Amino acid sequence: MTQPFRSELSRYLRTATVGGSILLIAAAIALVWANSPVSDSYFALRDWQIGPQALHLNLTVGTWAQDGLLAVFFFVAGLELKRELVVGELADRKRALLPIIAACGGVVVPAIIAATIGAGTPGMDRGWAIPVATDIAFALGVLALTGSRIPTSARVFLLSLAVVDDLLAIVLIAVLFTSSIALLWLLGAIACLAVYAFAQHRRITTPLLYVPLALLTWYCMHDAGIHATLAGVALGLLTRVRRDPGERESPASRLEHRIQPLSAGVCVPVFALFASGVALSSELLGQLFTNPISQSVIAGLLVGKTVGIFGISWLAIRLGIAKKPRALGFRDMFALSVLGAIGFTVSLLVADLALAGIGDGSEAEIAKVAVLVTSLTASLIGSALLWRRGRAHAARKDDSDVQELPGGVDK
């Protein structure tokens, strides 16, 4: 592969709409494959175990994609979030507070709705956690495809909201479904992060230190029994974003420029390929609106996430606790709140954990189908709303441009 071709390919993959398109194509392929006559080959490949057993890394291909490749995406997300917190949209404390408040609303309200509807149903004593998570990769992918004319502050809000949301989901998974956390491995991960932060402070730049250190951090986090993607977010947030005198670009900008094409072109699509294959059947689809588990998931995601994110955000802004993102209206924020209902992969994971061993296994399957259908519905509704808001923003910009021209008509 020639250098000019590599450069052009990298530039192409950095385009948000391209990354979003590849992600959704991979998800569609997985869904078709998992429900085709050769579906056995999909599940056999996804469940194939590979890796050194001695290091407790004899994981399935699907787990490698979810815990390994997705950690790269979370690292890039951490870099973006750190930049916005230090020098960008979230440098204003009240604007930084809004996605945190919104994420809390987006966890609490769905949990209450799911617990209320599913009360007394076997498995729902922990199954209420299924609709609390937002799938950051898919939500940002849909936004990239359908919200290109929305102000960039929309991506910042959704990114920061989804990161906080996923961190809360990871805490819930640790509390509800992890029998014990290996404290020594957790301390090892914290020590690795401390070394990384110290190296950043001392302006050390060699990848010979950072690559092994990042891998060791991921390994310690994994063996501690905590979702290993957390290592990616933590490393991203510890990376320096301000340039020193004489520096052409900061370490965060340099790393994001190099890793973003890998994340968008390889890591996220492969993750989507192995995470999106849900087997559908007419029997399961027929129970979708009658089974209390699926009712809990659908209402929790579609209603709970939207109302929780938007309602708490609206209240915080009205009370002066937080500030609205720049150039965004409440209608924009409502559309973004609908995208928050794309639970997808994290919700599928929680469904597996919460409903494993309950009944004949159909409970987990109906929950997964509910997650899939609801996430697709949220994607379509959110896309339609974003498209309408994009047209409104474009029309407003055109009107503004006309007014600035000589002889333009004032409003």
Curated annotation (Swiss-Prot):
Keywords: Antiport, Cell membrane, Ion transport, Membrane, Sodium, Sodium transport, Transmembrane, Transmembrane helix, Transport. Its main location: membrane. GO terms for molecular function: sodium:proton antiporter activity. GO terms for biological process: regulation of pH. The chain crosses the membrane at residues 18-38, 59-79, 97-117, 127-147, 167-187, 218-238, 261-281, 297-317, 338-358, 366-386. Na(+)/H(+) antiporter that extrudes sodium in exchange for external protons. It is a multi-pass membrane protein. The lineage of its organism: Bacteria, Bacillati, Actinomycetota, Actinomycetes, Mycobacteriales. GO terms for cellular component: plasma membrane. InterPro entries: Na/H_antiporter_dom_sf, NhaA. It catalyses: Na(+)(in) + 2 H(+)(out) = Na(+)(out) + 2 H(+)(in). It is found in: Cell membrane. Belongs to the NhaA Na(+)/H(+) (TC 2.A.33) antiporter family. This is Na(+)/H(+) antiporter NhaA 2.
